[in-house]
Amino acid sequence: MAAHGQGFDGVERRGLMFVLSSPSGAGKTTLSRLLIERVEGLSLSVSATTRPMRPGEVDGRDYRFVDKATFAVMVKCDELLEWATVFDNRYGTPRAPVEAALSSGRDVLFDIDWQGTQQLREKARADVVSVFILPPSATDLERRLHTRAQDSDEVIRGRMDRAAHELSHWAEYDYIVINQDIDEAFAEVQSILKAERLKRERRTGLTAFVRELQRQLEN
């Protein structure tokens, strides 16, 4: 797990996998977009999927589109960090581009559920930093889902039921952010990322840096 990428202070460090999870409507997608737009050195993980490409989507940008046989080979050869089946389509995170990013000191953002997060921890626990986003109340969550005007009442009821199940996994996460205000929630998430980037064990160039500093002080 050696790293060769320079941090912003010139010290080499290994990148990290920054995971955001939340019930639908709690703000995960908005926070992910803000992080990608405003934080340097962070890229969004691009999943492989067997579902058909939709109008406006670009292969390699939105998803890596593959057929079912190719996906099966990727699973068999352990080429995916995590994968799941959703409505008869398979989705997964290719290992190689993530490893390349981490080794070069770049961080990768994951917008995934608790199951995907669990798989990431099993494959690379030391590289994973997980954040669970909570709404301030069930009433507020339901209001947000209605405000989006994307789903029928039946679909919203289903999302609320799933939210109760997803919430049962909150204690598996490293950090919890209650999204009462999107700007405040973003500031908290950004602070978490900044602190995790500075952790000693990720800054692989610190030993050499300190030795050089000691040498200078002794001369």
Curated annotation (Swiss-Prot):
* Record-annotated membrane-spanning stretches: none
Record field: catalytic activity: GMP + ATP = GDP + ADP
Which InterPro entries does this one have? GK/Ca_channel_bsu, Guanylate_kin-like_dom, Guanylate_kinase, Guanylate_kinase_CS, P-loop_NTPase
Provide any one GO MF term from the record.
ATP binding
Q: Which residues form the Guanylate kinase-like domain?
A: 15-194
Could you tell me the superkingdom of the organism this chain comes from?
Answer: Bacteria
The record's top EC class is transferase
Q: Which GO terms describe its cellular component?
A: cytosol
Where is this chain's protein located in or outside the cell? Cytoplasm
Q: Which residues bind ATP?
A: 22-29
Pfam families recorded: Guanylate_kin
- Name the UniProt record assigns to this protein: Guanylate kinase
Query: Which organism's genome codes for this protein?
Result: Nitrobacter hamburgensis (strain DSM 10229 / NCIMB 13809 / X14)
